[in-house]
Amino acid sequence: MKGENDMENLRNSTWMCCLSKVHDSLLMWAYYNNHKGICIGLNKEAVLNSCQYKFFGLMFPFAAEVKYKDILQKPDYFKDHLSWNDLLLTKAKAWEHEQEVRIITKDPAWVHAGRNIPDEFKKEDIVDWKEIRHYVPLSSDCFESIFLGVNMLPRNRTKIIDIANKLNPNIKIYQMTLDPEAFRLKGELVNI
C-alpha cells in the first residue's frame, strides 16, 4: 500500500538520536552493559547548534520528548492525518522510566556527517557499524559530563577520563556508586 511505503520511506529518511534525561536509573544502567559503560551528559542546545550547521536537509534538527502510550495507534492511511512527529515520538508506556528525548532530522545532507571515527578511537573496537552508518561530529562544548559505571574496568576508566579531558577540559566526570542506604545510584565528582 502507498501509505505503508510512505511510512517506511519516512523511517528510512529520518535520522534520530535517542537520549535520556536521567543518568542514575538502575534499570538503564543494568540494560546497557550491566553498569560497565558510561553515560554522556550533553548540552542539548549546543548539540542542536552543532548539528544545524552541518546539515542542509529539508529541516533543521530538533529535540523533542517522547510520549508514552498504552495503546498503539495504527494510522488509517486514508483517513488519519497523524503528523510524522507523532509516529517518531511515541513509545510504549512500559519505557516511561527512560524519560527519552530524541533529536531528529528529516532528509539530512549526510555528506556532512562523519564516516571515519576520530583518531583516538581507531584502535578501539567500540563502534558497531551495523547500527551506525554515519555520525554527526559534535563540537567539544556539547559534552558537559561523563558518568562512569559502577562496574567499569579500571583500565577503561582511565582511558575514558583521558579522552574526556582531551575532548573538553571543562567536562565534569562522575563515578557512579551504589547508595548504601537506598536502592539508587549516586554520582560522585572525580577529582582529576
Predicted regions and their residues:
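Catalytic-core loop-and-flanking beta/alpha module that positions acidic residues
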Residues: 1-192
